[in-house]
Amino acid sequence: AGSVKKYEGILNDSCETIRKSGNPAAMAAVTEYNVGTIIDSYREQTLEAAIFNAGMLNMFLRNTDKLAMCNLSDLVNGWPGGCIVSKDGHAFGTATYHVMSMYSGSRLKEVLDIDVFSPTYSTSEQIGNIEPLSGVPYVDGAACLDENGNTVIFALNRSCDQEAVLEIKYETPNKTVEKAEITTITSEKTSDMNTLPDESIVPAACMMQT
């Protein structure tokens, strides 16, 4: 999941180089990206993959000033981790499908600036094409306004053993929030995945008074 940090660095460096070359308004286009870093593996259907993809979506939102488009590769089947798995006339959504559904269903209108302060971790081994990383935040986030002017915050927790407690502060003076709708996707283990008879990794919503 920490590989998102590498991809965000590549995007920022690429756009900076292109814009310095004489086109300050140049935008990047992500023509295709996959739902995980290990291709042709059951892991593409797990909660682990959903955490990775939530991080990718947050990264894309934070960088909308640099991106003209972002396309996901193959929504249905196509490889073991297709977002929608179809077989013998039946279909179910992977954990990543439900994450994408949450984001797309939020009906976003505007991306807000956000600063996320979180403990970090480092990796010591190369995984696929991702070399060891340092300073990867456990908590990742993005903030937006929806069509009704409501603030929408997307937050993910990369820690496998620690819950994340979020403290949200607005820069707007006298900004108050009376209640919040919280929608979560989680499971006991990052290796958990949906199956045709048991699609249990789905969004769960509740209201909270502040």
Go through each PLM region and give its residues.
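Secondary-structure transition/capping motifs at alpha-helix termini
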Residues: E16-A26, M59-L67, S106, E171-T176
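A structural signal for isolated positions on well-ordered beta-strands in alpha/beta enzyme cores
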Residues: A29, V152-F154, E181
